[in-house]
Design a protein with these regions (language model features):
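Early transmembrane hairpin module of multi-pass membrane proteins
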Residues: 1-28, 34
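Interfacial loop-to-helix transition and helix-capping segments at the boundaries
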Residues: 2-7, 75-83, 130
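Membrane-interface transmembrane-helix boundary segments in multi-pass integral membrane proteins
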Residues: 3-6, 119-156
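Interfacial segments of alpha-helical transmembrane regions
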Residues: 25-39, 96-107
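Transmembrane alpha-helix/helix-exit interface in multi-pass inner-membrane proteins
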Residues: 27, 32-61
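Membrane-proximal helix-loop-helix units in multi-pass membrane proteins
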Residues: 47-102
Length: 156
């Protein structure tokens, strides 16, 4: 039961759900909000990859699910493949958002997730990821502000 609650509170499961919903909606603004959310989720994971913290996150994740692999190389390759499928492929399939309004709406939705769901269900991720996630949220806000400014300047 705890595992199911953790999984459904994770933003990664939300990202995979968005990929399914994306194909259903015909209204472009909804599709654009969904693609914006997928991009934001990708950007939330990016600092972990950039700093190399992802390896410690992988170790703690496997430990939390009681999965033991003796081969370190195999362990990291399998984790990276799963991580790539969950965070990168949805972003690639949905593409970049087309307007600033959808970016703002998506950022607002992600903020609601962060401040309401994540803050109330504190054991969603491993302790290491929990200690670093607020930096990812700040990073996403900076990236979205930059993207918003660039979009505004390019499409005046």
């Amino acid at each position: 039961l705890n595992l199911i609650r953790r999984l459904f509170s994770m933003i990664t499961v939300i990202n995979l759900t968005l990929l399914i919903i994306y194909k259903i909606f015909k209204i472009q603004i909804l599709k654009d909000v969904i693609s914006s959310m997928s991009m934001i989720i990708f950007l939330m994971v990016f600092p972990f990859w950039l700093t190399g913290d992802i390896f410690q996150a992988y170790d703690e994740m496997l430990d939390s699910f009681n999965i033991e692999l003796q081969n370190t190389y195999l362990k990291y390759v399998l984790c990276f493949i799963v991580d790539f499928c969950i965070h990168v492929i949805p972003f690639i399939l949905m593409g970049f958002p087309q307007n600033n309004t959808s970016i703002i709406i998506a950022l607002f939705i992600i903020d609601i997730w962060y401040f309401i769901i994540y803050q109330n269900v504190s054991d969603i991720y491993t302790p290491f990821v929990n200690s670093k996630l607020h930096y990812s949220v700040i990073f996403v806000h900076i990236c979205m502000l930059f993207l918003f400014i660039v979009n505004s300047l390019l499409f005046v």
